[in-house]
A protein has these predicted regions:
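Intrinsically disordered, highly charged
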Residues: 1-8, 38, 42, 231, ...
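Metallo-beta-lactamase
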Residues: 2-6, 52-54, 106-167, 171-248
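Conserved beta-strand hairpin/beta-sheet module of binuclear metal-dependent hydrolase folds
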Residues: 8-69, 176-187, 192
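Residue-level marker for buried hydrophobic side chains located in beta-strands
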Residues: 46-48, 77, 100, 183-185, ...
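Active-site HxH/HxHxD metal-binding segment of metal-dependent hydrolases
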Residues: 54-57, 64-147
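C-terminal/domain-terminus segments
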Residues: 119-126, 130-131, 236-269
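Hydrophobic alpha-helical topogenic segments used for membrane insertion/localization
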Residues: 289-318
Length: 372
């Protein structure tokens, strides 16, 4: 089985190996993928997704390390257009003068026509879920750069790859498959970390989960997409969130998740639990009623505290890092289902423990409010 090879420089800008001619860059909590052989010529490789806002320079440095200083991609392919996958797309499309491809049902959100269905911050039981209420939701407009991905299933600039429709997490979500070795770029059709938990998202603890609950507006389609991907028995996969996964661990995990999707992946309650957002080629058509909870009273405080913790978390020394790990280990946050996040602090290199404590305190306060 192939092992993940990591070569980290001082800035963390060197892509990591997933499979032959497939590497990825971790941009804080989201992955950006590079399809192409190291040293590929100008326009001889493809970028998949564009990370968080402000990540253009890191992506360009990573591309230069992979393919050379002057090498530009043949195309940018978007698995979907959520803010954490298109953060640098404006800058990169302009500076590289490169086309951006997405499924036709994603185009309304990439051409300024429609906002996505709003997130549901009260599902998933983690700080990241609660923070989602403040995530950017407005559409972007890529203008002349964006176009519909070829209907024949081919992936521009990536011979040997094809795209697969995997809607649910987003109306026009796609994943990429290389049949020759059953390698998948999944996007957010499933994840390999518990993305609803800020601690897990920051520490990248490896475990298979469904799509991020807070941003998934159609659970029936999400389940069908996961079952479809599991049917390929992929040998390797890189998702939008979490480390690469391979072999039997990946295959067994996907099979189990597909078999228990409604229990393990679909939230126990929430706005989209039983009633999806209705969308079409023009964007959002109709939304299920908003489920208001007194928990929203503390939402702003949690989001602000977590955001501050993230902003100040990088570049900590080893002593502080060990202190943070210990806090996260000893002070688990409790999710909506009563499950503990204690083990998610393992290997933390951020102030994840502080965020975990904050989430726990606020969740306990919310429970008291809801009980009144």
């Amino acid at each position: 089985m192939l092992e993940s090879v990591t070569h980290r420089d001082a800035n963390g800008d060197t892509p990591r190996y997933v499979a032959p001619e497939l590497s990825y860059l971790l941009d804080r909590i989201v992955n950006v993928c590079f399809i192409g052989a190291p040293g590929a010529t100008d326009r001889g490789w493809t970028l998949v997704d564009c990370g968080l806002p402000g990540s253009a320079s890191r992506i360009k440095r990573a591309a230069a390390r992979m393919f050379g200083e002057r090498s530009r991609p043949a195309a940018i392919v978007l698995t979907h257009g959520h803010f954490d996958h298109v953060g640098a797309v404006h800058t990169l499309a302009h500076e590289w003068d490169v086309p951006v491809y997405a499924h036709e049902l994603e185009l309304p959100y990439l051409t300024g026509q429609s906002s996505y269905p709003p997130p549901d911050p009260l599902v998933g039981g983690g700080a990241m879920s609660l923070m989602s209420a403040l995530f950017p939701k407005r559409p972007i407009d890529l203008g002349r750069h964006v176009r519909e991905i070829p209907a024949d299933g081919s992936v521009p600039g990536a011979p040997g790859w094809r795209w697969i429709p995997t809607p649910g997490h987003a109306p026009g979500h796609i994943s990429l498959l290389r049949d020759s070795d059953r390698t998948i770029v999944a996007g957010d059709a499933f994840t390999t970390t518990k993305q609803e938990s800020l601690v897990a998202a920051l520490t990248q603890r490896a475990e298979i989960h469904g799509p991020p609950m807070y941003f998934t507006p159609d659970w029936d389609r999400a389940r069908a997409s996961l079952i479809h991907l599991a049917g390929y028995a992929p040998a390797a996969a890189i998702t939008g969130h979490g480390p690469p996964m391979r072999g039997e661990r990946l295959q067994n995990g996907l099979r189990n998740l597909a078999s228990h999707f409604d229990v393990w992946a679909r939230p126990a309650r929430g706005r989209y639990r039983d009633h999806p957002a209705i969308t079409d080629g023009s964007g959002v058509v109709d939304l299920p009623p908003l489920q208001v909870s007194t928990r929203t009273v503390v939402l702003g405080g949690l989001a602000l505290g977590a955001a501050i913790a993230i902003a100040t978390s990088f570049g900590r020394d080893d002593d502080e890092r060990r202190r943070t790990e210990e806090i996260a280990r000893l002070s688990p946050s409790t999710n909506d289902d009563g499950a503990s996040d204690a083990s998610e602090g393992d290997g933390a290199d951020t102030r994840a423990g502080d965020v975990s404590l904050l989430a726990r305190t606020l969740n306990e306060s919310v429970s008291e409010i809801d009980a009144r």
